[in-house]
């Protein structure tokens, strides 16, 4: 999750010890073993570090260049949950990150941030723009014991169990529900300028925040739009570089 003190506050082993000093050398070894192929160093930021750009830059200083930092998704009363004040800080941080990335690119030391990867000339087809990741229909999560779920974030939620690897999909009702979950399934999305970038958002995030896969995770929505704004700004700036 970036800085040692941030990572070790939550990424602990069974004995409660922080993991930073053990995982960083292993991450470096993994990236080296990739032999130049792509990878992503992914972290999560919480109420403890809304200034998450410091963690992104820390990863970059360690030598990692393909990075992703995701906002935490949890119940509003969870100590890790982002507050309304945090959201304003995070939005400012996204701008700081975009400007820093442009500077690094000019200096010949670029880094990639997953959420700023935006193709304005090609990009996904209209079906993908509407349907998004395809959880529950185009792909599923398979548990070690053979059960099928719409995606890994639903594993353990029995009502979302689709079937198993022996009998296949037997819960057609749930699959149909996911098939109809798209950018046009939510009233809140009807007039949103970003709906064909987010495809209605993550079904799992919506469910965990609202109790329905057709709900809208408002905080995530707000941050997503800010990320797209920054990504578009970067595209414009890169045209002049």
Question: What is each model feature region?
Answer:
Residues 138-153:
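Active-site and channel-lining beta-strand-loop segments
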Residues 5-24, 28, 32-139, 157-158:
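Radical SAM enzyme [4Fe-4S]-AdoMet core and its adjacent flexible, acidic
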Residues 7, 133, 162-165, 178, ...:
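Short clusters of hydrophobic/aromatic residues that line enzyme substrate/ligand-binding pockets
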Residues 89-122, 152-199:
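C-terminal accessory region of radical SAM enzymes
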Residues 145-147, 184-241:
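Radical SAM enzyme core and accessory elements
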């Amino acid at each position: 999750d970036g800085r040692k003190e941030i990572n070790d506050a939550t990424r602990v082993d069974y004995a409660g010890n922080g993991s930073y000093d053990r995982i960083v050398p292993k991450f470096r070894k993994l990236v080296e073993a990739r032999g130049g192929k792509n990878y992503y160093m992914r972290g999560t930021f919480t109420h403890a570090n809304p200034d998450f750009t410091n963690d992104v830059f820390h990863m970059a200083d360690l030598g990692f260049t393909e990075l992703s930092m995701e906002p935490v998704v949890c119940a509003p009363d969870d100590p890790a949950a982002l507050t309304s004040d945090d959201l304003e800080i995070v939005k400012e941080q996204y701008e700081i990150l975009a400007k820093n990335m442009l500077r690094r690119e000019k200096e010949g030391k670029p880094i990639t941030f997953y959420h700023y990867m935006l193709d304005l000339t090609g990009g996904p087809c209209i079906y993908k723009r509407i349907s998004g990741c395809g959880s529950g229909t185009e792909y599923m999560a398979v548990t070690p014991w053979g059960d099928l779920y719409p995606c890994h974030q639903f594993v353990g939620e029995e009502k979302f169990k689709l079937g198993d690897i022996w009998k296949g999909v037997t819960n057609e009702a749930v699959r149909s529900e996911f098939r109809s979950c798209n950018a046009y399934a939510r009233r809140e999305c009807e007039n949103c300028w970003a709906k064909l970038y987010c495809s209605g958002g993550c079904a799992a995030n919506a469910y965990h925040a609202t109790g329905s896969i057709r709900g809208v995770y408002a905080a995530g929505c707000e941050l997503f739009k800010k990320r797209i704004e920054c990504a578009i700004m970067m595209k414009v700036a890169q045209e002049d570089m």
